[in-house]
């Protein structure tokens, strides 16, 4: 690895941080609710939990009493439950608006702090050599050019061949794997490992449909078909 190892470490940090944010996407709503610093959102959250506990209490009370023996009390509780449902719906909508604004802020922070710096680093240091080749002719010229200059070399290779008559790699010294190709290979490896883990470990195997026994199959084949009369007309020759 070249002396500029900080570039590689920064790329690994950006990739791992992006994966952590991807894996924890289902928990981010709870984090947004807990990390909201506005006093209005905290007040709405406390009101929501108070009303929710009151609603649960009234439901338990209605289940414990009889509607025939305590009709007035049961009707009063039902009326309160309807009012609580409306209040809970209003507060829930306000909390969702707050969470939506928090998600927008988080998306901007992620864009400014993760996506843009990683993109700038990849463009700025795309020709940085991560691994050097021990020999110049270790691989074919086309492969060496792609690893040294990225996939753009593969696209411009035919033009270079038509202009010079050969694929010149002499200007690609020292020969090795560039940062752009190394990042592409690392991300492809991580995605492949994720796919294998999901398919082999996380996802449950699909069991085949149950097969009918031979005796049941024979019984179905031997069972006579029932004929139904759908018309009462009789035709005479």
Swiss-Prot record:
Principal cellular location given in the protein's record: endoplasmic reticulum
Positions in the Lumenal compartment: 1-4, 132-176
Segments in the Cytoplasmic topological domain: 25-110, 194-237
Gene Ontology cellular-component terms listed: endoplasmic reticulum membrane; GET complex; Golgi membrane
Membrane disposition: Multi-pass membrane protein
Gene3D superfamilies in UniProt: Helix hairpin bin (1.10.287.660)
Keywords: Coiled coil, Endoplasmic reticulum, ER-Golgi transport, Golgi apparatus, Membrane, Transmembrane, Transmembrane helix, Transport
Region annotation Disordered: where it falls in the sequence: 205-237
MF terms in GO: protein-membrane adaptor activity
Cystine bridges: none
Record-linked Pfam families: CHD5
Coiled coil: 40-99
Composition skew (Basic and acidic residues), residue ranges: 217-237
Source organism superkingdom: Eukaryota
GO BP term (any one): tail-anchored membrane protein insertion into ER membrane
Record-annotated membrane-spanning stretches: 5-24, 111-131, 177-193
Compartments, as annotated in UniProt: Endoplasmic reticulum membrane; Golgi apparatus membrane
InterPro entries, alphabetized: Get1 (IPR028945), Get1_fungi (IPR027538), Helix_hairpin_bin_sf (IPR029012)
Family to which the UniProt record says this protein belongs: Belongs to the WRB/GET1 family.
Quaternary structure note: Component of the Golgi to ER traffic (GET) complex, which is composed of GET1, GET2 and GET3. Within the complex, GET1 and GET2 form a heterotetramer which is stabilized by phosphatidylinositol binding and which binds to the GET3 homodimer.
Functional summary from the UniProt entry: Required for the post-translational delivery of tail-anchored (TA) proteins to the endoplasmic reticulum. Together with GET2, acts as a membrane receptor for soluble GET3, which recognizes and selectively binds the transmembrane domain of TA proteins in the cytosol. The GET complex cooperates with the HDEL receptor ERD2 to mediate the ATP-dependent retrieval of resident ER proteins that contain a C-terminal H-D-E-L retention signal from the Golgi to the ER.
HAMAP family for this protein: Get1
Name the UniProt record assigns to this protein: Golgi to ER traffic protein 1
Record lineage: Eukaryota, Fungi, Dikarya, Ascomycota, Saccharomycotina
């Amino acid at each position: 690895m070249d002396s500029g190892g900080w570039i590689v470490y920064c790329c690994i940090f950006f990739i791992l941080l992006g994966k952590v944010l991807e894996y924890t996407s289902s928990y981010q709503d709870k984090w947004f609710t807990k990390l909201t610093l506005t006093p209005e959102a905290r007040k709405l959250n406390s009101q929501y939990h108070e009303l929710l506990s009151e609603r649960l209490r009234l439901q338990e009370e209605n289940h414990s009493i009889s509607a025939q023996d305590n009709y007035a009390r049961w009707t009063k509780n039902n009326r309160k439950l309807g009012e609580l449902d409306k209040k809970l719906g209003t507060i829930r909508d306000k909390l969702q608006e707050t969470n939506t604004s928090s998600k927008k802020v988080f998306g901007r922070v992620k864009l400014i702090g993760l996506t843009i710096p990683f993109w700038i680093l990849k463009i700025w240091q795309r020709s940085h050599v991560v691994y050097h080749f021990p020999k110049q002719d270790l691989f074919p010229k086309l492969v060496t050019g792609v690893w040294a200059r990225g996939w753009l070399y593969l696209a411009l290779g035919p033009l270079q061949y038509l202009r010079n008559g050969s694929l010149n790699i002499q200007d690609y010294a020292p020969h090795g794997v560039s940062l752009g190709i190394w990042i592409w290979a690392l991300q492809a490896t991580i995605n492949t490992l994720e796919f294998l883990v999901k398919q082999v470990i996380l996802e449950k195997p699909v069991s085949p449909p149950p097969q009918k026994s031979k005796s049941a199959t024979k019984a179905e084949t031997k069972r006579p078909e029932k004929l139904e009369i759908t018309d009462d007309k009789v035709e005479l020759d």
